[in-house]
Amino acid sequence: MFACMYYGALRPAEAVNLHKSDCELPDAGWGRVYLSETTPEVGKRYTDSGELHDLKGLKHRPDDEVRPVPIPPELVRLLRWHVAEFGVAPDGRLFRQSNGGVVNSSTYGQVWRAARHIALTPAQVESPLAGRPDDLRHVAVSLWLNAGVPAPTVARRAGHSVDVLLRVYANCIDGDEEIANERISGSLG
């Protein structure tokens, strides 16, 4: 699930609801996931179903909209392995709790906190560095922008508007002045 956020910039509520039928996972090369629903966790008191999660359309999109997201070979391999190793939930979801239910934020948050203690130094654990799983999505978007992927493409893949993308991530682009100078010099001849 965390790999989907890191490699594909999925929101946690999109990742927990990812179904095998939403995925194109070729033997080699890039794949694709097709996102059409999200499962936000809002609490039983606030859902139509009385469950912890409610099935909704994509954030800030019409209910019937599908967002295709190309995924790199690294994520394709991880998802293929995950399905082979763990199978899928009865409804086809890739990720599930031990009882088959939707993965709760408290569950993946607990795993995330434990992973931070293993992977980071004590000082880093005390810092905001990778403080929450949603930060993986921000890392993905920042990585794409720093790799030179055009903002409209990044926005489309991440499910943002270009306006939101540039407002939130404009300062994450490192070395952009030097790159801009080189491109302008190249165009000037």
Language model features by range: what are they?
Residues 36, 72, 96-98, 170:
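Residue-level detector of conserved, well-ordered beta-strand and adjacent loop positions
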Residues 8, 69, 77, 81-156, ...:
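Short, basic (Lys/Arg/His-rich) helix/loop patches that form interaction surfaces
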Residues 23, 39, 151, 158-183:
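Catalytic-site neighborhood detector that most strongly recognizes the C-terminal catalytic loop/helix
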Residues 18-21, 139, 167:
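Structural detector for helix-capping/boundary residues
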Residues 1-16, 142-146:
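Short pre-functional
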Residues 16-17, 155:
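Short, surface-exposed helix/turn micro-motifs that flank interaction/cofactor sites
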Residues 17-84:
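Conserved tyrosine-mediated DNA breakage-rejoining catalytic core shared by Y-recombinases
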Residues 184-189:
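Intrinsically disordered, low-complexity basic tails/linkers immediately adjacent to helix-turn-helix/homeobox/MYB/SANT
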